[in-house]
């Protein structure tokens, strides 16, 4: 393994922590087509906040010819000497919730241009079972002119990064590995085992590893959909859902999930990958898609609950001032991709309310680019007819929310983290 040189393709929330970890033992080239991202990383700063600046700076190198460490580049020339290529690009869905494999195709083309005999290409992106061998490998073969499992090989090791989580970092999460042949499976497993302290699980085939990843997220999506449905039912009965879940949770085998908005680039997306693949085989999934529909309905449900509470408090809805706390997809993380807080905001605006969005974690330029919404990173002055806590950022727990409300204002807690006696409604 001494001659090993790794290229990590895609330096986002998944790729950068992995590249940094590999760089503690191996020479690593981090490759990304975004030149701004490369400049930022080479200066020793990570805007995703997944890798602390000091930790990043500890492995950074100034050129591609180093012994161990990380060099970030957008130049194809810098990755041509690598013999392991790890692809960590996003796998989103389009506006019709169909899998969009464009980033995978493009990154496979990139690797195909520098692929040599004996190289191993490992995919980490979440896909449906069969995508690596049926969609990605043909691109590698076509561009490189090499033959799969003769000249070059493949592996699949699904990412399990939890953005914003400083406890379960990449090396502390057990890694599923796989290879295109039994021998390659062992090599891929050994590579990850050398840096992942939590250990590895070698799956028998690439398809098994792909399927394992996509059901991890689908299972979580379905479990959250169940408690979201319970929240709707118990709210009609005037029963506190969180109190019910707390009581039920005293049984040893009750699974603890909380109601909420399900967004981000994994849980709200991956079930569609599995569903489409199932449909290609002639099976129409019922529970998977029902869970997606229910979770996707929660933003408009929250908005309508807030409007109902405002009407009951004799608040005029048109031009009412509403403060939304948080637009990222989860707490203590700057990632705004596929955030469902946007559904709440858009629904509120459809009632002609004036919505102010405060999020100290979100990059305002990114929010404008993604959703055409104005946000602020500093707490705005003034008082509001309604405040909705949509994201549990630690900063929000320190706010005196009562002082931001008008005398008859409404406080709604989507996350269930505020004192229930202080709020007018919660999921």
Where are these regions (language model features)?
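Structural/interface elements that position substrates and couple domains in central-metabolism enzymes
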Residues: 1-427
